[in-house]
Amino acid sequence: MHRRDFLKLTAALGAATSLPLWSRAALAADFSPLPIPPLLQPDANGKINLNIQTGSVVWLPSTATQTWGYNGNLLGPAIRLQRGKAVTIDITNALPEATTVHWHGLEIPGEVDGGPQALIQPGAKRQVTFAVEQPAATCWFHPHTHSKTGHQVAMGLGGLVLIDDSDSETLPLPKQWGVDDIPVILQDKLLDKHGQVDYQLDVMTAAVGWFGDRMLTNGVPYPQQITPRGWVRLRLLNGCNARSLNLALSDGRPMYVIASDGGLLAEPVVVRELPILMGERFEVLVDTRDGQSLDLVTLPVTQMGMTLAPFDQPLPVLRIQPSLAIGSQVLPESLVVIPELADVTGVQERWFQLMMDPKLDMLGMQALVARYGMKAMAGMNMNHGDMGAMDHGNRPDMSQGKMKGMDHGTMNGAPAFNFSHANRINGKAFSMTEPAFDAKQGKYEKWTISGEGDMMLHPFHVHGTQFRILTENGKPPAEHRRGWKDIVRVEGARSEILVRFNYLAPASTPYMAHCHLLEHEDTGMMLGFTVSA
């Protein structure tokens, strides 16, 4: 964050905290409380019921927005699982369309992973049973319906999975759910003039992703969480379809990162800014012992489409209000043992070239600028990709961000461009029936994922594993990204990861590897692969 932005935020915050107590109470009353997802744990028989259903939420005055949720109107419960124990989940689909439930971050066999082949038809049920054999972590579950994932997530489907183990239970970490152990699911939303979720998969969103003009935290705009005075644990999930975030605290105090996607780090890592990609999770500790209220804010990012108001300046997403109660006073010096990286000499290597059809690149950028103006380009010029030397600076019809008479799907009367397979890996769009390769169970592989020649942001996710990042976008990984991960950043350069698959995945239910910008995934930037013994 630029110093001037911090000063602005700090001044605003200071004005609020200098108010007399009675008006501070009135100010607090203006905040909605942060909704805390209910904990859902296996019953005495090791079972959990999950109902995928329609619902409604009031985000705008006098308007009910139609939404989808798991066991409720929106989002879902936090499913709490224990390492070493099996669970059986009975899933019922009460939606009007088919869906799947993918267990993002869980190391489980392909047949229960919930990829696009594992469709649950409307009115149908599916039962999955698996044992949890991985370290404590914050994971999540969400749809993975081919070509429909972006829409189904935008409608509200998503929930947390909390894995506990002996390390997480014995370490002196905040553990009171909804008190000092706080889930923070961040998602942007776009509503139409009728107050309904305005989701379109078109040439623009296929190129840059679907993005909103408001931010929700656990489904509520800018809520407040009252916490004890002490160390507070935030379990952060970027649940956005396409928007990367960069989180900070409004008064500039540090956050201590204690866990990434796949579990606890070796020791807390101090950061003042925390970039978090779509689908990623981080756990951070925040020191509230001084009793001062503060905001979790998302800072501006340089990503196409994501620079528009209100995201063009620091945007508060959660007010943290310490009470008089005394909370955890301990910051652990060390957490868990992270194994040394395995020797990659002689291991199987694979190459993944992420690419967008140049025509989609061109049409998508044109549609973005036509709809939102040059500000949406995040500082990139218009010859990004294949747009040649178009000089938009002096075009009279571009001055107001309009391109007169342009149909976003057609150019010069040509047939509409079919973008449904325009995003690819190694030149191929996703196939539901042809896995791209077979990996061997328990064997390390080194994967290189390249975004060279494509300046788009691609958070690359691999099913069925927690991997280690060797290099990220051409550089050594940041310290807090050196633990267990299931998403790596690819943006115009190469990333290298060390993967290993402990379970089998047959051709009927292969694992997926894909871009977690959901509209890229839905338009082909995904492949299936098998794991055999």
Swiss-Prot record:
<dbReference type="InterPro" id="IPR045087">
    <property type="entry name" value="Cu-oxidase_fam"/>
</dbReference>
<dbReference type="Pfam" id="PF07731">
    <property type="entry name" value="Cu-oxidase_2"/>
</dbReference>
<dbReference type="GO" id="GO:0005507">
    <property type="term" value="F:copper ion binding"/>
</dbReference>
<keyword id="KW-0677">Repeat</keyword>
<dbReference type="InterPro" id="IPR002355">
    <property type="entry name" value="Cu_oxidase_Cu_BS"/>
</dbReference>
<dbReference type="Pfam" id="PF10518">
    <property type="entry name" value="TAT_signal"/>
</dbReference>
<dbReference type="InterPro" id="IPR011706">
    <property type="entry name" value="Cu-oxidase_C"/>
</dbReference>
<feature type="domain" description="Plastocyanin-like 2">
    <location>
        <begin position="221"/>
        <end position="290"/>
    </location>
</feature>
<dbReference type="GO" id="GO:0030288">
    <property type="term" value="C:outer membrane-bounded periplasmic space"/>
</dbReference>
<feature type="binding site" description="type 3 copper site">
    <location>
        <position position="516"/>
    </location>
    <ligand>
        <name>Cu cation 2</name>
    </ligand>
</feature>
<feature type="binding site" description="type 3 copper site">
    <location>
        <position position="144"/>
    </location>
    <ligand>
        <name>Cu cation 3</name>
    </ligand>
</feature>
<comment type="similarity">
    <text>Belongs to the multicopper oxidase family.</text>
</comment>
<keyword id="KW-0186">Copper</keyword>
<dbReference type="InterPro" id="IPR006311">
    <property type="entry name" value="TAT_signal"/>
</dbReference>
<feature type="binding site" description="type 2 copper site">
    <location>
        <position position="102"/>
    </location>
    <ligand>
        <name>Cu cation 1</name>
    </ligand>
</feature>
<dbReference type="InterPro" id="IPR019546">
    <property type="entry name" value="TAT_signal_bac_arc"/>
</dbReference>
<feature type="binding site" description="type 3 copper site">
    <location>
        <position position="104"/>
    </location>
    <ligand>
        <name>Cu cation 2</name>
    </ligand>
</feature>
<feature type="binding site" description="type 3 copper site">
    <location>
        <position position="142"/>
    </location>
    <ligand>
        <name>Cu cation 2</name>
    </ligand>
</feature>
<feature type="binding site" description="type 1 copper site">
    <location>
        <position position="458"/>
    </location>
    <ligand>
        <name>Cu cation 4</name>
    </ligand>
</feature>
<dbReference type="Pfam" id="PF07732">
    <property type="entry name" value="Cu-oxidase_3"/>
</dbReference>
<feature type="domain" description="Plastocyanin-like 3">
    <location>
        <begin position="416"/>
        <end position="532"/>
    </location>
</feature>
<dbReference type="InterPro" id="IPR011707">
    <property type="entry name" value="Cu-oxidase-like_N"/>
</dbReference>
<dbReference type="Pfam" id="PF00394">
    <property type="entry name" value="Cu-oxidase"/>
</dbReference>
<dbReference type="GO" id="GO:0004322">
    <property type="term" value="F:ferroxidase activity"/>
</dbReference>
<keyword id="KW-0560">Oxidoreductase</keyword>
<feature type="signal peptide" description="Tat-type signal">
    <location>
        <begin position="1"/>
        <end position="28"/>
    </location>
</feature>
<comment type="function">
    <text>Multicopper oxidase involved in copper homeostasis and copper tolerance under aerobic conditions. Is responsible for the oxidation of Cu(+) to the less harmful Cu(2+) in the periplasm, thereby preventing Cu(+) from entering the cytoplasm.</text>
</comment>
<feature type="domain" description="Plastocyanin-like 1">
    <location>
        <begin position="53"/>
        <end position="166"/>
    </location>
</feature>
<protein>
    <recommendedName>
        <fullName>Multicopper oxidase CueO</fullName>
        <ecNumber>1.16.3.4</ecNumber>
    </recommendedName>
</protein>
<feature type="binding site" description="type 2 copper site">
    <location>
        <position position="461"/>
    </location>
    <ligand>
        <name>Cu cation 1</name>
    </ligand>
</feature>
<feature type="binding site" description="type 3 copper site">
    <location>
        <position position="463"/>
    </location>
    <ligand>
        <name>Cu cation 3</name>
    </ligand>
</feature>
<keyword id="KW-0574">Periplasm</keyword>
<feature type="binding site" description="type 1 copper site">
    <location>
        <position position="515"/>
    </location>
    <ligand>
        <name>Cu cation 4</name>
    </ligand>
</feature>
<feature type="binding site" description="type 3 copper site">
    <location>
        <position position="514"/>
    </location>
    <ligand>
        <name>Cu cation 3</name>
    </ligand>
</feature>
<comment type="subunit">
    <text>Monomer.</text>
</comment>
<keyword id="KW-0732">Signal</keyword>
<dbReference type="InterPro" id="IPR001117">
    <property type="entry name" value="Cu-oxidase_2nd"/>
</dbReference>
<dbReference type="InterPro" id="IPR008972">
    <property type="entry name" value="Cupredoxin"/>
</dbReference>
<keyword id="KW-0479">Metal-binding</keyword>
<feature type="binding site" description="type 1 copper site">
    <location>
        <position position="520"/>
    </location>
    <ligand>
        <name>Cu cation 4</name>
    </ligand>
</feature>
